């Protein structure tokens, strides 16, 4: 079994002062302590390690080979320890840390992009890890505390112990080819899409499970003719006349050639929410929440 040493950092600081000064009196003055206790501490360290660190003369000391090695390693260890403690202080102030953030793909369009860009620029020591997951998976990861927060378009309230905050209001639009027979409508009834073919993305990237339920509430299940991974590919296929899609209004900013966007007559909210465990908010998360909700 590997030996566990009980030497604390204070003993190493005492040793390093003597090793650098090569004189107990000067080292004691540097440490603002008297010489006898310093000599006792150095002897204690030598006893713990079972080796002599200094050769003592009447007016000076010389490092042994073991002492020279310990001096090099002690400098490195104390610098590392100081860096670790400084980082923990930064984490406590929200100036550093890591945030595991679940997102649906559609969340990264619209207002969130400039907000996140500014947050990352202003907090360079906060590492935000984006994990693209469908809402149900995000909620499961939140409950297992594998995510700090999740962002999706809410259809239900979160479980007890979790908080949801609306980041901004949004709505779903119909994206269709510009020559589509519904393009003359200023608003499109959802039931008018009953016989249309849909192009969409997998649930991990989008809100399609929610949209399917909304369509079923007005009496039809949408027919998916193509499923692709990127919103740009969805809109490219819409522009080719392959099908239509329901998409958050933030995508209308993309201004795709050959694609027109129309609001639905029955507004389907696409409001974006952030969900997190109420009692597990780190200082870095507090800063992120402030940035996202200001």
UniProtKB/Swiss-Prot annotation:
InterPro entries: LysR_subst-bd, Tscrpt_reg_HTH_LysR, WH-like_DNA-bd_sf, WH_DNA-bd_sf, XapR_PBP2. Residues 7-64 form the HTH lysR-type domain. Keywords: Activator, DNA-binding, Transcription, Transcription regulation. The keyword Transcription regulation applies. Residues 24-43 bind DNA. GO terms for cellular component: protein-DNA complex. One of its GO terms (biological process) is regulation of DNA-templated transcription. GO terms for molecular function: DNA binding; DNA-binding transcription factor activity. NCBIfam families: PRK09986.1 (NF007439). Belongs to the LysR transcriptional regulatory family. Positive regulator required for the expression of xapA and xapB. Binds to the inducer xanthosine. This is HTH-type transcriptional regulator XapR. It comes from Escherichia coli (strain K12).
């Amino acid at each position: 079994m590997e030996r566990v040493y009980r030497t604390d950092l204070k003993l190493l600081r005492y040793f390093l002062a003597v090793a650098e000064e090569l004189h107990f009196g000067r080292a004691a003055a540097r440490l603002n302590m008297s010489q006898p206790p310093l000599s006792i501490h150095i002897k204690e360290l030598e006893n713990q390690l079972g080796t002599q660190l200094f050769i003592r003369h009447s007016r000076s000391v010389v490092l042994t080979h073991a002492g020279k090695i310990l001096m090099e390693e002690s400098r490195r260890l104390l610098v590392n320890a100081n860096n670790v403690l400084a980082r923990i202080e930064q984490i406590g102030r929200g100036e550093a840390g890591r945030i595991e953030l679940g997102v649906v793909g559609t969340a990264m369009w619209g207002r969130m992009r400039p907000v996140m860009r500014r947050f990352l620029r202003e907090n360079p020591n906060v590492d935000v890890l984006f994990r693209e997951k469908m809402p149900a998976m995000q909620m499961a990861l939140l409950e297992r505390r594998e995510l700090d927060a999740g962002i999706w378009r809410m259809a239900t309230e979160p479980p007890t112990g979790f908080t949801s905050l609306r980041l901004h209001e949004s709505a779903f639009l119909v994206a269709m080819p510009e020559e589509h027979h519904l393009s003359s409508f200023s608003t499109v009834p959802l039931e008018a899409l009953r016989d249309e073919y849909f192009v969409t993305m997998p649930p991990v990237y989008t809100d399609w499970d929610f949209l399917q339920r909304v369509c079923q509430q007005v009496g039809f299940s949408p027919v998916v003719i193509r499923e692709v991974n990127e919103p740009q590919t969805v809109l490219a296929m819409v522009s080719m006349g392959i099908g239509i899609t329901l998409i958050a209004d933030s995508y209308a900013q993309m201004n795709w050639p050959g694609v027109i966007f129309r609001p639905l007559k029955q507004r389907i909210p696409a409001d974006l929410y952030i969900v997190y465990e109420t009692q597990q908010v780190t200082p870095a998360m507090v800063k992120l929440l402030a940035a996202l909700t200001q």
